[in-house]
């Protein structure tokens, strides 16, 4: 090895280290300070207590998370576990830099352009570092950051193996890769998608090149992929069920002996195969942590996989139902029975022909759904977010790419120009021109970690959240091509120049330009949106929801976001452990019902036998009145609550969760207070509205329908907030202790609202929608006071809401709610606040014609602001005339308006004309009023009312 080669290797490693430090600093500075929404609360809690999370479990992540939770770097356990993500994500970027170098070296192995190779790789890796999805994963506790690292590590190792193929110890790389893949099964099955890429790199390195062998290699790789998934991941538990633990142990011992024998006998291929399988199994053995801990019954023990049959169900993700590639799950996909009829045999199994008919039912709809939703919206849009830009699809300059008006589309201007995308596309062409084998291998990796997932998952619409985090490995693969594109572009520029000095100068200039316009521009553009500093919304909402509940309550929650953060507070922070958090989705499962019964058997609220629980299922139901016993008092003299219960499933049945809610209400017999979180859907509240009393972030079940809200508790919770006031206006990390003294692990009224009024703290639209639950509470409290003629308290509630979360920082997504706020302000005499909200309303992008008319009338009737009403109705009138002209010239289709919509416009026109006339009249704009009325009368000569108005204007003008 030459001196220059040694020096360049050291420089390469040094740059990789610097990349780690830079990216870690960025990720750490933007890291979530505590628990976040979605799965993070569950993962942090289960890591800390070594519990059992939702299938398929991610045991390796839990073990690493447990280690980090023990490092005393913060009093906040979530902060400790969170810090692993910035570390592992920064390591991923360092590996990506090395991988880019490997691919460029395979195109140009000379040392002449080593500097430019490294800087091209540096720019590409930093570009990926600051893409949306990778950065999102890097700042919270989730498996995807760790999974991305494992993918990068496997790619790096197989590329290193191909470089060392002539060394005597090259096989160790393949063995190590097998172990990493085994370990990665304890994270996410996404890592298995690298296997076809690995197979192709091996084939192109040592195989005899032919189309037949290439196809066989790819097929063999897929066999290995499904073999690991079916034989090892799913098969070992089934094998254990057949052989028992003793039999399985004996089989493993035999395998170890055979492996040792093959190594000593120099049977190379056999030894590699046996060693690889053994190491995959050893890596996979992290799942023993899940099964062992489940047997010890931790407080979070999802699916209870402590027996072999339950473990098999857990690994198969049976909880989520059967996954099928066909048919694609387009909207209104008919049921299988409605298409192919009842099952053909006596065992309720559909025949092969029936399955085939259903798979290929309505191919045009399937194809349309596959492209328009699953590929275009749920992958291509995400891909373009990374390298072109992300923005509100309601913006006229943002391409929707399948997104609805309240979702993010593709903002081609976010990074100035989509240079990263252009360089990546150039890199693909350059790669295929210079090294078709590597390019094809990389293309397979790109497709397997992107489009192939789309085909396999067959997601239905709509999804509860954006799913871009699942395709980060695909985006990382594209970033390798960005590095190749930069390198090829620099070579093209320098090759076009004659003098060497000019070549060097131009190369340095181009590198500087790329660094400036790609990673730096992306860093600046994405920083605020990915900065979680000061974001305590999940922690605070969980705390506030728990503190809404009286001691020893039962709290029904809806899904991940109103359950996992609560689990975190209870299991990790030990806050309000007396509250029973009963997740409605999980109440559909027998294991969860059994766990709730056993965990709280000292003060039971589920009095069901094992047989009753196991027989739980849907119940056919027709709407009818039902009753449950209730305490007798002055508000309830009959001693029961009665209400009409409607079907909740397809209009014909009650779900298991509904039956369990009814059973819990009955068995509890009013011993424990029962609450429904405000996030629970109306359907899941089972029409109990008349007996649900709002107390903050939860509705309490009461025995009467006299009051829809509890004013005293609402005021105590919403208006008597705890913590230092500075939290609302500024973020100061030195004030942690002030807040910590005020929170209570026991029942205490008073909410926390940290940083909701701090413009420096980014609140994404989804979080913005979640915190509207606070606003709803404030508004309902205010309206309650208003109806009781207590106008001072009504106004005070709204003013406190404005102080805590001003609409200028966290917009009000519901126009109906904001109009209610404006109306209450008007009712209490605060015209300035009313006008402020009305002006915000008319600037919204989601308004319909009737909204503009309503708001314009409000400016006239309640605010007497004729300048504003004039602007509104002039705009509406001009739009009417433009639409009319367009329809006359181009027709309805080209104008993109339906005949029904045009009829609505025509029916509204007289009112628009009249309200615009009123605005002109009160502003003494008589000329404009005359022109308006004359134009109307010319088209409607029989309108005597308009003629009277015109006469009125003429009289006013003459006087």
Where are the regions a protein language model picked out?
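Membrane-interface starts of transmembrane alpha-helices
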Residues: 11-15, 73-84, 112-124, 169-177, ...
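Loop-to-helix entry region of an early transmembrane alpha helix in multi-pass inner-membrane enzymes
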Residues: 59, 71-94, 98, 114, ...
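Short helix- or helix-capping micro-motifs
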Residues: 121-129, 181, 185
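ER/secretory pathway lumenal C-terminal domains and tails of membrane proteins involved
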Residues: 2, 101-107, 134, 139-148, ...
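Alpha-helical transmembrane segments
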Residues: 13-26, 122-126, 176, 217-225
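Transmembrane-helix motifs of polytopic, lipid-linked glycan transferases
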Residues: 17, 83-111, 153-157, 422-429
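N-terminal membrane topogenic signal
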Residues: 4-18, 213
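Extracytoplasmic catalytic/substrate-binding loops of multi-pass membrane glycan-assembly enzymes
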Residues: 31-43, 53-64, 301-303, 533-537
